[in-house]
């Protein structure tokens, strides 16, 4: 369904996603002003699009679905299930580009398809980690082989992720113990295990930083911001590639 206003909106949103993904990758922070230009352009273009297409078959369903999905994203962000930047990205996409202007309509909406595509693409991360660790000869529990890599102790604070080893010192000897898989949900979410805490609150982490400096390597989980696969998923969805459609075609 080609629509010039929708194409302009899609271009603005895609450029915003690329900028936000880059910021999130480099600093794990997305500046609030990043969203403003696309929100204004997308808002105007979305109104023009709906004025032209609101009476076509299925338009009301798409509009209601877009509004419901945006509301759910806001709710999930409030409940801590999404990051604020991720929620803003999905709300912007859902409202500003309800359908792709560059391909046939994909079920159920562009935003949903982009999110599902992102989930599928994210599966490459554990495969990459496992392959990398096997090639390098790194050894750790299997779950960690699929989710992390070893880093020099002195550089851990510059990584993005969670410490996957507990480091202690007894009688001048450094001892390391892997976090058990059944404890990861609670243990790895501890602020004191987050590498960002080591950077931003060094005075509180002085003891941990001192121990890490003495370690040759320490295992750290690999943190990939959702905005990175989400942006890739959006690019695929914009041109009609939808994992949702593929899965439904296999099942039906």
Where are these regions (language model features)?
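A membrane-topology feature that recognizes alpha-helical transmembrane segments
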Residues: 1-252
């Amino acid at each position: 369904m080609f629509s010039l206003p929708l194409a302009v909106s899609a271009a603005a949103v895609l450029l915003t996603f690329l900028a936000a993904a880059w910021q999130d990758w480099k600093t794990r922070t997305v500046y609030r002003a990043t969203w403003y230009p696309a929100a204004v352009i997308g808002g105007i273009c979305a109104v023009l699009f709906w004025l032209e297409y609101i009476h076509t078959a299925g338009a009301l369903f798409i509009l209601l679905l877009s509004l419901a999905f945006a509301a759910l994203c806001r709710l999930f962000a409030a409940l801590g299930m999404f990051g604020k930047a991720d929620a803003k990205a999905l709300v912007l996409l859902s409202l500003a580009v309800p359908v792709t202007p560059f391909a046939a309509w994909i079920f159920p909406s562009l935003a949903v398809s982009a999110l599902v595509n992102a989930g599928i693409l994210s599966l490459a991360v554990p495969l990459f980690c496992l392959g990398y660790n096997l090639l390098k000869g790194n050894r750790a529990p299997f779950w960690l082989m699929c989710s992390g890599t070893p880093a020099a102790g002195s550089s851990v604070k510059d990584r993005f992720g969670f410490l996957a080893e507990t480091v202690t010192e007894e009688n001048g000897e450094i001892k390391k113990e892997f976090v058990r898989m059944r404890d990861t949900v609670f243990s790895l979410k501890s602020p004191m295990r987050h590498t960002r805490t080591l950077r931003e609150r060094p005075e509180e982490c002085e003891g941990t930083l001192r121990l890490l400096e003495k370690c040759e390597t320490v295992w750290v989980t690999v943190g990939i911001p959702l905005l990175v696969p989400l942006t890739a998923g959006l690019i695929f969805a914009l041109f009609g590639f939808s994992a949702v459609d593929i899965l439904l075609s296999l099942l039906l």
